[in-house]
Each structure stands twice: as structure tokens, then as C-alpha cells.
């Protein structure tokens, strides 16, 4: 639904409107507020809420609000009228009344009807969309319009854009803070949640702020690989992803910490980290998901064995490896995580796959075998593949190896990963709930 509440009041009713907004501040904070000149200033000064002001009533502010009703951006109008002592210069309600009737917008004209309107709005869920405008290769404006088209009829949608200057996790944490404050002051009927729209980096960054909060995460994938969405069975097309959110069915899944960095998918040591580094932004923009295949072929020619000390739940093993993958969740295309044939994201355990191919030919055989395991959902039977489980794992290597976590290079070994069971609430398709 539309995200704005319009506030108008005759002179003798301005104080009553300001006090009403103050009394229901937690609900009004979930919406964008727009008000005629002096009314908006009074509400802003008394409540501390952000209010966009249009012209005053005598200068046509009510007409500006009427235009927004026609545009479909107004969720409700609260216009406290003075039926006995209205002044000639004050706004006339008749135009707004006609438009609200035509466009089916709730209109309150006194405190009693205002209470009824906010009770209705209080039952509407608010989705805070964190939208990455540089993700993927599609038409960004069209994608955003498509999201609005599928979500705004069901929820109050508030949009935040990511930027290179601000950490996406910090953006999400600020929204989490506002949601918690609003929930503490409300009856909880209109719960809020956060939606991440972008690639795996955006999704991981937003999810990091939601771990162990209970606030649901919706995902609208628009990246190159969209690995987390694929792993959880979330549709990778915008209409399907929005439908999953609108259905409101949630699932609690595991997450992990990798060197104290939140992790949704997996940590790769050796081959996978080098491959991801080679598949840079320019290559992904040009080739899409094929960038990873191209980079993988290139890395297969260069990858060398390294010595690895692997400690799983306090038990240590030393071996030679070319790739070590520690997975919380992984799609079939993350072949180096497929030692068991599939990765569970609800069992409270990490899946560890170690590959130890010594030649490019052996490496190709390992990749083929692991991909077959993923398709058949059966464990690998290749002699150069070892699969293990554990709640926590620590890896040290000689020489040090690069580490990739959820598609981002974070440094070099040693690396320590701990599973956080049932720590993230996500909107999931019916079959995965």
C-alpha cells in the first residue's frame, strides 16, 4: 500500500492533531508523513518525527495533497475539521472527500474516525526495502517499479538505497533499531520486517544485522549468482520472490560466524577464494554467472596444494589440500561445498569439504564428481574428496591462503567458523517452510 499519511487541520484543531500524533507516535513513525505548512511544522516540533510540508491551506496545500492521492502515494488522510468555526481561508474538505471516495483512501475528519484509521493502519505490515541500485545487469528502474507493483498492494513499503559510502549492515542495523523501538510502543499487530534486494553481498550484509533479532528477512535476488536464494529455494525472478514475501511464511535457518564476520553461505580457502577474486566486477558485468566458470578454469591451471591443519570440534587433522570449503548453506553450483551431495541449513552443523587434487586433470575430475553429487544429492566417492561435519572448525595453512566469505575476500588464513543454529528468520516458499 502507499507509504504516506497526510495531515491537515483547521486552526482550532491543530493542537488536537499534534497531540493525537504524539499519542500514536510509534505507528506514525512507520509511515512517511506529509502535512500542510503550519500543521506540519507543529507536528515536527512536538513529536520529532520527519514531516514533509507542502504549502499552507490558504496557498493550496490541500490541492497538493489531492494530487498525491491521485498519484496513489497516500495511504490515509487525517483532516481534523472545525464544523462550527471554520474560517473562510481554511481548506475545504469537499475536494479531498470526493478524491478519497474515488481512490478508496481512508479519510478521518475527527478524533474518533482518526482512531479507526490508525487501527486499520496498525494492522498493516511494514517492509523496509534495502535496494542495491548497482546489483546485477538488469534495468534498475524497471526492477524497482516491478517490486513496488507486487508489494505495495500488500504492505507499507519504505525504501532505502545502498551506496558505496555507507556499509549496508549499518543501514540495516539502523532500521532494526527503529523497528524495535516501534514494537516496544505498539501492540505488535503490524509487525515490520526487512527486505534485501541485490546480490549475495547485499543479502549477507543485511542478514548480518538481523541475526538473533527475530525480525524476518525477505529476499529479492538481483545479483549475478544469487547463491543464497537458490540454496533456500527462493525464486530468483522478482514476481516470485515478492509472492514469497506476500505469503508471509517464515523459516528459521542457521547462520555462522567466520573470523567473527557473519556468514550465510560458505567460507572458501584456496581454490574458491582465488576463483572469486578472479571473477571481478567487470568480468561479472560482462559475463554474468559465466564469469565464475571462466575464472574457475583459469584457477584450475594455477592452483597448488597447501598444507592444512583442520580442527573440528577440538579434533585436529593435518593433510594436503587444494580447496577447503566450510558451508552453512550452498546451492548446487557451489560445487566445492558438495562433498555430502547437499548442504543442510537447519541442522546446526557446518559441512566441510576438502579437495586434494594434485593435477589439473584431477581437479577437473573432482569438480565433475562434486557437481554430479550435487545433482544426485549423494555423497562424493572421489578419492581426492573428504567430507566432514562439525559445529565449529578452525583451519591454519602453510603457506597462508586467501579466504572468501559469501563472495567477498576477507583476508588470509587462519580461519575459524562457528555455526549459529536457528539464528535467522526468513520468508521462504511453502515447500521449504
UniProtKB/Swiss-Prot annotation:
Per UniProt, residues of the DAGKc domain are 127-262
Active-site residue numbers: 62
Residues of the region (Methylglyoxal synthase) are: 1-126
Q: Where is the MGS-like domain positioned along the sequence?
A: 1-145
* GO cellular component terms, semicolon-separated: cytosol
Q: Name one Pfam family in it.
A: YegS_C
Q: Name any one GO molecular function.
A: methylglyoxal synthase activity
Which terms does the UniProt entry file under GO BP?
Answer: methylglyoxal biosynthetic process; phospholipid biosynthetic process
Highest rank taxon of the organism = Bacteria
* Family from the record: In the N-terminal section; belongs to the methylglyoxal synthase family.
In Swiss-Prot or TrEMBL terms, this protein is called Uncharacterized protein sll0036
What organism, scientifically named, is this protein from? Synechocystis sp. (strain ATCC 27184 / PCC 6803 / Kazusa)
Task: Please name the taxonomic classification of the source.
Answer: Bacteria, Bacillati, Cyanobacteriota, Cyanophyceae, Synechococcales
